[in-house]
Amino acid sequence: MRLVDGAAAIQGDLPAAATRVVDVPVGAGESQGTGVLRLTALQSVLTNQQRVLASTTGPVITIGGDCAVELGAIPHALASSAESTIAVVWFDAHGDLNSPETSPSHAFHGMVLRTLLGDGPEALVPGSPLSPAQVVLAGTRSLDDDEAAFIDASGIRTVTSTELQQPGSVAEAIAQTGASRVYIHVDLDVLDPAEIDGVGYPEPFGLSVQQLVQAISQIRASYPLVGAGITEFAPSTPEAASDDLPSILRIISALTRPVQRPEEATP
């Protein structure tokens, strides 16, 4: 329930009129022989999320929950901007590039990006998968061997935590995709454990909040945002949630505040 509590804690600081809630079943769900834990529960959440998204207009900021919320959010953003070429920047300590066959845990949050790329359980693969050429992994520093091999074989672009300290590094990687618009995924474990406590799978040598906010700001200075996701907030107690919320709200602000790009400036 920590992920549910994390999402609820963030919701408490968001404007109610601009927030919609997706119902999440409390049952454990079944794998149905797919090698994916809780598959049927994931299907139910995806259906509910798609129903809510169908009634929205404009870019949506999706608050998880785990990274599986991107199964509904990213295809929705791409379909809403079908005339544009979209890059997905995946800020995450982990690649989320396992498959049911390679996953050590069979937990779906480690397979989300692979599924969005069209290689995952059939019931969850989107109708129009991403291409590896659209994806930029940012701040990723913990990969299983099969994930690393998939990155090498597919040519997915990567920007390390060290490289993110260089201004413009992630924008340059996006430019190489040829995209005109961007979707930003943020798994909060991309941050260094010294920066945030409420994540389930912390990894050392991550970003500071300031570095992440700056990277998001640099992206938005060059590319319109078609949507974003913030995931994996799992505080252990309400008090711990309160300690982390100021950092999370800074990230939300970086994703939502108005931005005037150079081409939009008034002469």
Locate each region found by the language model.
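Catalytic cores of soluble, metal-dependent hydrolases
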Residues: M1-I61, A73, A79-E83, D152-P267
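Internal, well-ordered alpha-helical segments in soluble enzyme and binding-protein domains
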Residues: G6, H109-V112, E147, S169
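Active-site histidine-anchored catalytic micro-motif
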Residues: P59-P126, Q134, Y223
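Short beta-strand segments
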Residues: T62-G65, V89-D92, A138-G139, H185-V186, ...
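Short, glycine/acidic-enriched loop or turn micro-motifs at the edges of active sites
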Residues: V69, A93-L97, S142, L188-V190, ...
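Short, structured patches in soluble enzyme cores that scaffold and shape functional sites
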Residues: W90-A93, L117, L137-S142, T160-T162, ...
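Short, surface-exposed, charged loop/turn segments at secondary-structure junctions
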Residues: T102-V112, F150-T158, E203
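Short, glycine/polar-rich helix-capping loops at beta-to-alpha or helix-loop-helix junctions
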Residues: L143-A149
